[in-house]
C-alpha cells in the first residue's frame, strides 16, 4: 500500500544510521539494575507509538518497532466484537478512538460496566467485518496530531502478532463484562493457543486464575493490574487498596503487577514529587515484578522533571534505591533512550560531540533568568557557556537581565507602575525599563520566572518563581571564573539608544568589566560577545581572544555568499532561530534549509536558539521530546552550539554514548527527518504549505556606526534621585500603560 511505502521512506535513515553489528557494545560496562531479576527494565509500547499515530494502528506499531530499543514489548488492549474477533483498541467504547459515531450516528447505547453506567458506541454491538469495512481510527488525545484521523484501519490481534514484534503483551480489561454478554476472552486466547503472546495482564483476579494453567504451559507471563486505589476489583469486590496490603497473595496467580506510576512516586497538589512509596520494594520482596503505567511525553507531570520526559523515566529506573521492571509508554523511543542511553551515567562521561551547551539566561527553565540561582543551576547541570544579557541601570551599573524591560521577569509592575514609559526604539509596547531605575531600585524588586507559554496554562517551577537575586556583570564574571566554566557569552543590545538617549555606554561598561576580570588577556575560558548590531561587534575587533557572535533574530531561508562575507567582517559565529534551520508548520517540520552548510563554508560557526523542554514548543517530528530536537540540530544539522533554557537536558544527551552516530552500538539517538512525518497523512489533511523564508541579505548585516555617549553623566550621577518625565508625556504613558499594569497585577496575583 502507498501509505506504507511513504511511511517506511520516513524511517529509511534508521537502516543507514543503525549499526550493522553490536560488536562495539561489548566495550560498554554492564549496567547493574535494581530490578527484580537484575535485567534491564522493559519498554512496553501502549498501542505502538500511540503518542503520534492512533493507538494500535499499523503505522503506530511499525514506528514503535523501528525507533525503539531491540527488546521492545508491544501492548494491545483487547476488545471483542459480537462475533468473537479480538481487536486492539484503547477502550470498550469506540467513539473516542474511531469514526464510529459519524458512521452510525444513532447507534449509541448504555451498558453497565463494572457497576457503572457507560454511554457510547460499544465494540460488542458490531461484528468484525462491520468494523473493518466501515470504521477507521482517530487519535484519542486531542493534543496529539489529528491529521492522521480517519486514514488507518482498526487492527485485529492477529494483525499485530503478524508484524512479529520482539514481544507481545495483551491487556484484558473487561473479562467480566464480556462474559456477561456471552463473549469469553479466555476462550479466545485458547483459540490462539497463546501463540506469540508473552504477557497477559488484567485487573480481574478471576480471569487471571482462569487462564493460569494454559498460560503456564505456553510460558506466558501473567500480570495483575492495579486500578485506582478506591476502585473495586470485580472478582473479590475488594478495593485495590485492600489487595495492595497482601502482595504475597498475588504471587499465587501472577508473576508481576502493573500499577499507575503514582503508586510509586506520588505527586502532591502543587505538582511536586512526594517521597517514594515502598511499593516496589514490597513487591520485589514478594517476588513480583513491577511495571509502571501512564508515561507520555505530552502530559503535564511533576515540576521536578523540568518538562523533560527522560528525567521522569530515570526517576523510576535509576534513582539509586530501586528500579521498576518495565514502563508502559505512549512514546517508546523516549523510554528506550532513557533506559539504554541515559541510565547510570553518573555525570562523568565525556561529551560525545563538540557542540557547546550555552544557556539562555542561565537555567531559566528552572529559576528566574539571570539570577544567582539560575547560573548556579546551569553550572550544576553541566553547561559549557553561561550567558549574561547586559542591561544598564540609570546610575550606570551593568547587570544581567534578559531585557531592558523589567515587567515580564520581575515584580517591578507592583512597585514602579507609574514609571512605565514608551520606548519605540526598543519595543512596540510600554514597559518599565532598567535605564529609568537606579540599581538600588532594581534590587528592591524580586526576580520572576518567565513562562513563555503562560497563555496555554504552562507554568515553570512555581515554588521558586521569585527565587534568587540579580547580579552585576562584574559579579557574573567573578562567578564564571570561580566555577571554571568553559566560557561566557555577553549579549549587548540597544547600545545605540543607550548611548545617544540615556548617556549610558554599555559597550564601554562591558569592556571595562572584562578587563578588570582579566578575561581579555587569557585563553583558558572562552569569551563570546553577542549582539544583533554589527557596529557593537566591530568595536570588539581589537580583542583577538573574543569570539564575536551576530544574533540574527528573524527567520532566514538561506545565507548567500555575499551575506556570509559581510558577516565575516564583524563576527566569527551567528546565533540563528530554530526555524531558520528547520521550517515548521502547525507543529510539523516541513523542511530543512542549507543555512548551516552555507555558514560553515564561510568558516562561520552556528549556534541555534532558543531550545525549551515544554512539549508544545517541540515539533511532532521530534516525538514531543526535547532530546530528539537536540539530536536533530546537533547530529542532523551540525550546529556548533545550542542555546537552551534547560542545560541539563542538552548535557545529558551530549554525554550519552548514544549521541555519537559514528560508533557502532545497539541503539542510537537519531535526528528527525525534516518534513518526513507530515507526508504520511493524506494530502488534504496536511497543513497548507507556507512561503519559504527569504535569504539573508548583505544589507541586513550592516548597522550604522555607534553614536558617541551623550554627556548626561551629571543627571545619571544623582544616585537614588528619581527623574520624572514631563507631565504631559508621563500622563500619556501612564494612561496607555494602565491595561498592561492591570493585566500584570492580575497575573502576579496582586
Curated annotation (Swiss-Prot):
<feature type="domain" description="GP-PDE 2">
    <location>
        <begin position="355"/>
        <end position="654"/>
    </location>
</feature>
<feature type="glycosylation site" description="N-linked (GlcNAc...) asparagine">
    <location>
        <position position="603"/>
    </location>
</feature>
<feature type="glycosylation site" description="N-linked (GlcNAc...) asparagine">
    <location>
        <position position="134"/>
    </location>
</feature>
<dbReference type="InterPro" id="IPR030395">
    <property type="entry name" value="GP_PDE_dom"/>
</dbReference>
<keyword id="KW-0319">Glycerol metabolism</keyword>
<keyword id="KW-0378">Hydrolase</keyword>
<keyword id="KW-0325">Glycoprotein</keyword>
<protein>
    <recommendedName>
        <fullName>Glycerophosphodiester phosphodiesterase GDPDL7</fullName>
        <ecNumber>3.1.4.46</ecNumber>
    </recommendedName>
</protein>
<keyword id="KW-0732">Signal</keyword>
<feature type="glycosylation site" description="N-linked (GlcNAc...) asparagine">
    <location>
        <position position="304"/>
    </location>
</feature>
<feature type="glycosylation site" description="N-linked (GlcNAc...) asparagine">
    <location>
        <position position="716"/>
    </location>
</feature>
<feature type="signal peptide">
    <location>
        <begin position="1"/>
        <end position="17"/>
    </location>
</feature>
<comment type="similarity">
    <text>Belongs to the glycerophosphoryl diester phosphodiesterase family.</text>
</comment>
<dbReference type="GO" id="GO:0006071">
    <property type="term" value="P:glycerol metabolic process"/>
</dbReference>
<dbReference type="Pfam" id="PF03009">
    <property type="entry name" value="GDPD"/>
</dbReference>
<dbReference type="GO" id="GO:0006629">
    <property type="term" value="P:lipid metabolic process"/>
</dbReference>
<dbReference type="InterPro" id="IPR017946">
    <property type="entry name" value="PLC-like_Pdiesterase_TIM-brl"/>
</dbReference>
<feature type="domain" description="GP-PDE 1">
    <location>
        <begin position="41"/>
        <end position="339"/>
    </location>
</feature>
<dbReference type="GO" id="GO:0008889">
    <property type="term" value="F:glycerophosphodiester phosphodiesterase activity"/>
</dbReference>
Amino acid at each position: 500500500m502507498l501509505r506504507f511505502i511513504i511511511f517506511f521512506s520516513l524511517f529509511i535513515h534508521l537502516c543507514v544510521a543503525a549499526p550493522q553489528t553490536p560488536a562495539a557494545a561489548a566495550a560498554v560496562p554492564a549496567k547493574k539494575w535494581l530490578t527484580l531479576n537484575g535485567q534491564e527494565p522493559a519498554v512496553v509500547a501502549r498501542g505502538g507509538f500511540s503518542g503520534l499515530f492512533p493507538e494500535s494502528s499499523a503505522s503506530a506499531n511499525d514506528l514503535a518497532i523501528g525507533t525503539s530499543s531491540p527488546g521492545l514489548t508491544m501492548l494491545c488492549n483487547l476488545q471483542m466484537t459480537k462475533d468473537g474477533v479480538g481487536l486492539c483498541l484503547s477502550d470498550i467504547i469506540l467513539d473516542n478512538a474511531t469514526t464510529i459515531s459519524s458512521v452510525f450516528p444513532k447507534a449509541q447505547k448504555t451498558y453497565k460496566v463494572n457497576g457503572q453506567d457507560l454511554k457510547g458506541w460499544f465494540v460488542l454491538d458490531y461484528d468484525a467485518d462491520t468494523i473493518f469495512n466501515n470504521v477507521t481510527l482517530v487519535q484519542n488525545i486531542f493534543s496529539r496530531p489529528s491529521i492522521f484521523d480517519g486514514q488507518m484501519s482498526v487492527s485485529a490481534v492477529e494483525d499485530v502478532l503478524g508484524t512479529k514484534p520482539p514481544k507481545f503483551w495483551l491487556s484484558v480489561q473487561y473479562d467480566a463484562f464480556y462474559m456477561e454478554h456471552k463473549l469469553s476472552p479466555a476462550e479466545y486466547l485458547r483459540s490462539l493457543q497463546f501463540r506469540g503472546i508473552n504477557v497477559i495482564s488484567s485487573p480481574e483476579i478471576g480471569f487471571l486464575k482462569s487462564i493460569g494453567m494454559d498460560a503456564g504451559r505456553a510460558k506466558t507471563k501473567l500480570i495483575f493490574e492495579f486500578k485506582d486505589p478506591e476502585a473495586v476489583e470485580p472478582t473479590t469486590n475488594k478495593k485495590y487498596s485492600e489487595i495492595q496490603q497482601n502482595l504475597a497473595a498475588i504471587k499465587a496467580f501472577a508473576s508481576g503487577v502493573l500499577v499507575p506510576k503514582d503508586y510509586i512516586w506520588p505527586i502532591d497538589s502543587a505538582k511536586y514529587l512526594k517521597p517514594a512509596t515502598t511499593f516496589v520494594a514490597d513487591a520485589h520482596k514478594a517476588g513480583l515484578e513491577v511495571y509502571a503505567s501512564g508515561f507520555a511525553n505530552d502530559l503535564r507531570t511533576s515540576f521536578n522533571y523540568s518538562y523533560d520526559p527522560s528525567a521522569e523515566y530515570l526517576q523510576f529506573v535509576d534513582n539509586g534505591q530501586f528500579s521498576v521492571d518495565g514502563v508502559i509508554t505512549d512514546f517508546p523511543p523516549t523510554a528506550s533512550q532513557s533506559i539504554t542511553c541515559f541510565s547510570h551515567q553518573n555525570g562523568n562521561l565525556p561529551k560525545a560531540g563538540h557542540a557547546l551547551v550555552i544557556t539562555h539566561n542561565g537555567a531559566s527553565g528552572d529559576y528566574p533568568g539571570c539570577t544567582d540561582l539560575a547560573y548556579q543551576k546551569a553550572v550544576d547541570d553541566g553547561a559549557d557557556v553561561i550567558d549574561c544579557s547586559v542591561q544598564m541601570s540609570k546610575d550606570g551599573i551593568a547587570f544581567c537581565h534578559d531585557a531592558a524591560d523589567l515587567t515580564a521577569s520581575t515584580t517591578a509592575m507592583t512597585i514602579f507602575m507609574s514609571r512605565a514609559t514608551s520606548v519605540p526604539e526598543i519595543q512596540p509596547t510600554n514597559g518599565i525599563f532598567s535605564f529609568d531605575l537606579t540599581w538600588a531600585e532594581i534590587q528592591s524588586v524580586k526576580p520572576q520566572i518567565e513562562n513563555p507559554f503562560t497563555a496555554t496554562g504552562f507554568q515553570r517551577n512555581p515554588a521558586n518563581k521569585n527565587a534568587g537575586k540579580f547580579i552585576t556583570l562584574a559579579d557574573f564574571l567573578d562567578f564564571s571564573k570561580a566555577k571554571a566554566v568553559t566560557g561566557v557569552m555577553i549579549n549587548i543590545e540597544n547600545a545605540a539608544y543607550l548611548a545617544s538617549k540615556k548617556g549610558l555606554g554599555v559597550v564601554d561598561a562591558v569592556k571595562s568589566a572584562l578587563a578588570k576580570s582579566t578575561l581579555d588577556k587569557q585563553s583558558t575560558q572562552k569569551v563570546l560577545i553577542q549582539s544583533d548590531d554589527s557596529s557593537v561587534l566591530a568595536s570588539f575587533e581589537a580583542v583577538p581572544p573574543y569570539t564575536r557572535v551576530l544574533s540574527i533574530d528573524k527567520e532566514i531561508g538561506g545565507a548567500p555568499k555575499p551575506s556570509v562575507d559581510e558577516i565575516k567582517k564583524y563576527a566569527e559565529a551567528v546565533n540563528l532561530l530554530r526555524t531558520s534551520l528547520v521550517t515548521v508548520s502547525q507543529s510539523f517540520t516541513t523542511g530543512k534549509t542549507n543555512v548551516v552548510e552555507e555558514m560553515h563554508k564561510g568558516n562561520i560557526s552556528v549556534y541555534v536558539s532558543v531550545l525549551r523542554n515544554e512539549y508544545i514548543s517541540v515539533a511532532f517530528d521530534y516525538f514531543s521530546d526535547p532530546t530528539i530536537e537536540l539530536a536533530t540540530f546537533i547530529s542532523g544539522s551540525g550546529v556548533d552550539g545550542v542555546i537552551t533554557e534547560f542545560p541539563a537536558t542538552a548535557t545529558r544527551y551530549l554525554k550519552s554514548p548514544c549521541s555519537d552516530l559514528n560508533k557502532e552500538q545497539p541503539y542510537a539517538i537519531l535526528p528527525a527527518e525534516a518534513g518526513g512525518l507530515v507526508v504520511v497523512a493524506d494530502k488534504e489533511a496536511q497543513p497548507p504549505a507556507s512561503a519559504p523564508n527569504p535569504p539573508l541579505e548583505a544589507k541586513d548585516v550592516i548597522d550604522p556606526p555607534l553614536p558617541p555617549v551623550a554627556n548626561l553623566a551629571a543627571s545619571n550621577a544623582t544616585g537614588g534621585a528619581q527623574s520624572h518625565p514631563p507631565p504631559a508625556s508621563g500622563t500619556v504613558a501612564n494612561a496607555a500603560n494602565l491595561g498592561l499594569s492591570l493585566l500584570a497585577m492580575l497575573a502576579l496575583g496582586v
